[in-house]
């Protein structure tokens, strides 16, 4: 522990014990870091002062040095006291010079008041069930305070018009705006009396019953804007006497000045994100950010390369359907259009006006940034700002003077409020460049950094063509070096591993030899220009003997490639045979014995497996995908089963085998207590979720009701998994979700009866047919492809689900075609089973067509999607393995790459497709990724804890924890049938579905 000395600092207020514990804990963590630095032969000395305590932390030599120099400690304490006094004096000086800054503060306070007012209007609109801002009737709310309740205001702040708040209160409200919500309890009293002398005419009456049944139909009027004479409009209001759901009125709006940390620190990963598109990162309540490429996985990151489209909240009605916020709309029943609907449109913003405004502001900010950047590098004329470099080198390249809460990014990612605030602070903005060499070394690659959105497709087509040309050139030159006239695939890894024996001559200056996917357009063009000079030099041809086949296999996307299903089935069977043989050897038997996997999971202290590849837990082979199965097969020689208590597994062996086991012989050797302790290769211990290691219920383990336990996880508390109960539950949920989808589809067509959803049409035309209101992280697919958690999420969110059908004629044609093509078999099926099916759906009045091969067709599509996910995961694993210097595929830590932006960069992805786990990709996106497989490349910019590079763990102290978390990533938890999940109720345990925030 750090050494603590007592100083003579004056103490006015004693710190609470909790704060002191926090400081002590952090100091111990600092000391642990110093120990790790000492292992690298680095010396550290640190002095920390907290109230009356002086902490001396560092390595052994560092602490010894500081302890011998007491004058250092005294000087540091004295310096801290003086700085506190200076800070107090500065505070006084600021208060005295407040009058001199009134002009600056007037602009700032006006902006903050407008922001708070807009945010109050936004919250009030949500309470009324509208997706647009609604003016807040402040006078009525203050006069009748029990009608509308405002929750979440900071302690000590009363609700009133923002004009009555001072600067500090406005900032305080914006910092705590995440919890602010309006709750409408009842209509305002005396609705016919209005302040201001105007006589208002109301719209057509509309009402809605409370979902909780707490009160009857009510009418709530909204205040008009001050500058318009539009009549008041009635809004459908959902009234709740008490908030039954704490998240009902919460809309996940981030607060605080920090842009990169708030999302991860303040938003729990396990909580479903409602209205995540309204996440505001700074102190602006009126703007929201919508990802430009994909909305299925929303992890905001300021260092992300992909720009976000940020619009103000009033512009929701102008956003395209794919980028319109879907999870924030409260349910509203269809109501007749009011008579004055035409007048109401006057209150909405004009898109052309908004577009012209934001385009002009972005252009001004872009010119401002370029001018300031040119001043920093002392350049004349137009310059291009390397935005990715500023994001990846935040310590050496950054911008000062930006308004609080606004990060430095491309102007195209800002909304109108932030652009205006940046222009107000333009005099204070300054570019700081500490290392000019960072700009010079990559200047030629940065010419591609600023493509206009309109030319992105053209750029992608161009770079794809150039990379293919360079790849063909390299293959041709490589074949010439081998004395062949037919082009051969180049083993780039071998050339990187043996630079002295395998290298290339004639490349342009400062361009190393790598795979074409590493090059940008300028370098590719230079290589093509000197193509005649390029020559492959092979001094040791024997190094290439085993590489050609290895390299050509992943590069071929032809029908010669082995079928995925055959491949994974073969690998699983092979691993199953390895496990059975190793288990028999551990029991002293010569014949292979089937492994009772549930017994191993429930007794990890007495039954475990050593020698498994790093990061792979022991499970049934049916749980693994192709990358893990291949790693297990490669490392099969190291695998060893340890059976400390043979009596636990005897009841699961065939009758003839149990008598051959010598229990004493198995128990006599002294085996290590922990798996992997005697392994020569450092293994990371991975604990399988669920088992209770303290009280293993061995009595339940011995029960003879053991089926094919390879697929069924064993309950740690001794209760067995009931397949019948699980199957009944998931079948019922799937039927309910399917009925829900059919009902919503009928509503979208204006019908009172349900209509069977043509899922193929929704998959083929996602722009014309899509679904809004699904839970965060749940894509629209057939209910048969979901597991229990997602099915339950969909049913909980059923009120918000809405089908959007833009082309009803195409929809009706598809329904007619499917009905006409599948109706003849229906006449043949006149068995009692058909009658049962019809009676089961009679109450719902569903238009249903009985299809004999519907299940086969559905399963084939599910299997096809699984194959695509497996192939994409295999591709990512192989590319990631290449990036970290491994010669084999390595599981991609998707979650770590997401929460550590800038550490790993993925290049070569198709336009409009962002990098994420395959389970979150659409089928069309996965196909495009496989088509661009040659150009996808992982680049490790800076390692994160737990990353293995060239067989060396980056941070041994942190490796164990992350690996345990990574074992549950969606890309590696393969489920044989669908995305089945782990359900934790009293009697069953099913594999868990990946968290949507991963």
UniProtKB/Swiss-Prot annotation:
Nuclear localization signal (motif): residue ranges: 320-327
Main location: cytoplasm
Feature: compositional bias, Polar residues: 690-711
Tissue localization of expression: Ubiquitous. Isoform 1 is strongly expressed in fetal brain, weakly in adult brain, muscle, and lymphoblasts and is almost undetectable in other adult tissues, while the other isoforms are equally expressed in all adult tissues.
Modified residues (Phosphotyrosine): 248, 398, 503
Phenotypic consequence of residue 460 to F: No change on BTK-mediated transcriptional activation
Record carries keyword Transcription regulation: yes
Modified residues (Phosphoserine): 19, 103, 207, 210, 214, 412, 517, 668, 674, 722, 784, 823
PTM sites of type Phosphothreonine: 556, 558
Phenotype for residue 503 to F: Impairs BTK-mediated transcriptional activation. Abolishes BTK-mediated phosphorylation and impairs BTK-mediated transcriptional activation
Annotated function: Interacts with the basal transcription machinery by coordinating the formation of a multiprotein complex at the C-FOS promoter, and linking specific signal responsive activator complexes. Promotes the formation of stable high-order complexes of SRF and PHOX1 and interacts cooperatively with PHOX1 to promote serum-inducible transcription of a reporter gene deriven by the C-FOS serum response element (SRE). Acts as a coregulator for USF1 by binding independently two promoter elements, a pyrimidine-rich initiator (Inr) and an upstream E-box.
Disease: GTF2I is located in the Williams-Beuren syndrome (WBS) critical region. WBS results from a hemizygous deletion of several genes on chromosome 7q11.23, thought to arise as a consequence of unequal crossing over between highly homologous low-copy repeat sequences flanking the deleted region. Haploinsufficiency of GTF2I may be the cause of certain cardiovascular and musculo-skeletal abnormalities observed in the disease.
Protein name: General transcription factor II-I
Gene name per UniProt: GTF2I
């Amino acid at each position: 522990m750090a050494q603590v000395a007592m100083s003579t600092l004056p103490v006015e207020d004693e710190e609470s014990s909790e704060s002191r514990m926090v400081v002590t804990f952090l100091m111990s963590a600092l000391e642990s870091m110093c120990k790790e630095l000492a292992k690298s032969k680095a010396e550290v000395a640190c002095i920390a002062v907290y109230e009356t305590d002086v902490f001396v932390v560092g390595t052994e030599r560092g602490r010894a040095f500081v302890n011998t120099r007491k004058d250092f400690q005294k000087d540091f304490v004295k310096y801290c006291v003086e700085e506190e006094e200076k800070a107090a004096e500065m505070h006084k000086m600021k208060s005295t010079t407040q009058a001199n800054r009134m002009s600056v503060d007037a602009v700032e306070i006006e902006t903050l008041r407008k922001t708070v007012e807009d945010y109050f209007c936004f919250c009030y609109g949500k309470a009324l069930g509208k997706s647009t801002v609604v003016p807040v009737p402040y006078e009525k709310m203050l006069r009748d305070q029990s009608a509308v309740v405002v929750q979440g205001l900071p302690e000590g702040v009363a609700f009133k018009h923002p004009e009555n708040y001072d600067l500090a209160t406005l900032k305080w409200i914006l910092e705590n705006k995440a919890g602010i919500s309006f709750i409408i309890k009842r209509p305002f009293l005396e609705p016919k009396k209005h302040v201001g002398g105007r006589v208002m005419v109301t719209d057509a009456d509309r009402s809605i019953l409370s979902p909780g049944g707490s009160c009857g139909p009510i009418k709530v009027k909204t205040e008009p804007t001050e500058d318009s004479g539009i009549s008041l409009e009635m809004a459908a209001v959902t009234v709740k006497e008490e908030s039954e759901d704490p998240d009902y009125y919460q809309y996940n709006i981030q607060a605080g000045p920090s842009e990169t940390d708030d999302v991860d620190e303040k938003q729990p990963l396990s909580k479903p994100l409602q209205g995540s598109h309204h996440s505001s990162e700074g102190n602006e309540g009126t703007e929201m950010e919508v990802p430009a490429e994909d909305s299925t996985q929303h992890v905001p990151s300021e260092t992300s390369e992909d720009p976000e489209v940020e619009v103000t909240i009033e512009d929701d009605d102008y956003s395209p359907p794919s980028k319109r916020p879907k999870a924030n709309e409260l349910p509203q029943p269809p109501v007749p259009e009011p008579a004055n609907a035409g007048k109401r449109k006057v209150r909405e913003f004009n898109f052309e006006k908004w577009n012209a405004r934001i385009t002009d502001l972005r252009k001004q900010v872009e010119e401002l940034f370029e001018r300031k950047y040119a001043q920093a590098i002392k350049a004349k004329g137009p310059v291009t700002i390397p935005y990715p470099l500023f994001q990846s080198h935040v310590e050496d390249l950054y911008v000062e003077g930006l308004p609080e809460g606004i990060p430095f990014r491309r102007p195209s990612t800002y909304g109108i409020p932030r652009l205006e605030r940046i222009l107000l602070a333009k005099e204070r903005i300054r570019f700081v460049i500490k290392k000019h060499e960072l700009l010079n070394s990559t200047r030629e690659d940065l010419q591609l950094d600023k493509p206009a959105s309109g030319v992105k497709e053209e750029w992608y087509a161009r770079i794809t063509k150039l990379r293919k040309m360079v790849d063909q050139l390299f293959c041709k030159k490589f074949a010439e070096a081998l004395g062949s006239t037919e082009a051969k695939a180049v083993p780039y890894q071998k050339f990187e591993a043996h630079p002295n024996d395998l290298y290339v001559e004639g490349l342009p200056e400062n361009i190393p030899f790598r795979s074409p996917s590493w090059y940008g357009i300028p370098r590719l063009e230079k290589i093509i220009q000197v193509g005649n000079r390029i020559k492959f030099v092979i001094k040791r041809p024997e190094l290439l003997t085993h590489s050609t086949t290895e390299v050509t296999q992943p590069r071929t996307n032809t029908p010669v490639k082995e079928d995925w299903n055959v491949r994974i089935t073969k690998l699983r069977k092979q691993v199953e045979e390895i496990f059975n043989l190793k288990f028999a050897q551990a029991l002293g038997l010569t014949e292979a014995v089937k492994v009772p996997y549930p017994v191993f999971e429930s007794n990890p202290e007495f039954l475990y497996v050593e020698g498994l590849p790093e990061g792979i837990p022991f499970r049934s082979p049916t749980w693994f995908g192709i990358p893990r199965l291949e790693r297990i097969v490669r490392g099969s020689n190291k695998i060893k089963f340890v059976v400390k208590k043979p009596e636990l597994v005897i009841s699961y062996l065939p009758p003839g085998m149990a008598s051959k086991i010598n229990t004493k012989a198995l128990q006599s050797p002294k085996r290590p207590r922990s798996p992997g302790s005697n392994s020569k290769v450092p293994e990371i211990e991975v604990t399988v979720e669920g088992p209770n290691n303290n009280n293993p219920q061995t009595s339940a383990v011995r029960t003879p009701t053991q089926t094919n336990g390879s697929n069924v996880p064993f309950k740690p508390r001794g209760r067995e998994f009931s397949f019948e109960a699980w199957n009944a539950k998931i079948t019922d949920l799937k039927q309910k979700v399917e009925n829900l989808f059919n009902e919503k589809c009928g509503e979208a067509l204006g019908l009172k009866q349900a209509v069977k959803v043509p899922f193929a049409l929704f998959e083929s035309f996602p722009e014309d047919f899509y679904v809004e209101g699904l839970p965060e992280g749940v894509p629209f697919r057939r209910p048969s492809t979901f597991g229990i958690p997602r099915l339950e999420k969909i049913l909980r969110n059923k009120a918000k689900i809405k089908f959007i059908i833009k082309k009803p004629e195409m929809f009706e044609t598809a329904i007619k075609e499917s009905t006409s093509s599948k109706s003849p078999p229906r006449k043949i099926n006149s068995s009692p089973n058909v009658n049962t099916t019809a009676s089961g759906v009679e109450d719902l009045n569903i238009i249903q067509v009985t299809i004999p091969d519907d299940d086969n067709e559905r399963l084939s599509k599910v299997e096809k999607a699984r194959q695509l996910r497996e192939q994409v995961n295999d591709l990512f694993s192989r590319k990631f393995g290449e990036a970290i210097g491994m010669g084999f595929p390595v599981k991609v830590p998707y979650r770590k790459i997401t929460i550590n932006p800038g550490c790993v960069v993925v290049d070569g992805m198709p336009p409009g497709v962002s990098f994420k786990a395959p389970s979150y990709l659409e089928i069309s996106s996965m196909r495009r990724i496989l088509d661009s497989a040659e150009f996808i490349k992982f680049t490790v910019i800076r390692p994160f804890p737990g990353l293995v590079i060239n067989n060396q763990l980056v941070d041994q102290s942190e490796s164990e924890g992350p690996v345990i978390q990574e074992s549950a990533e969606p890309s590696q938890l393969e489920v044989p049938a669908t995305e089945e999940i782990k359900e934790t109720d009293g009697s069953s345990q099913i594999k868990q579905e990946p968290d949507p925030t991963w």
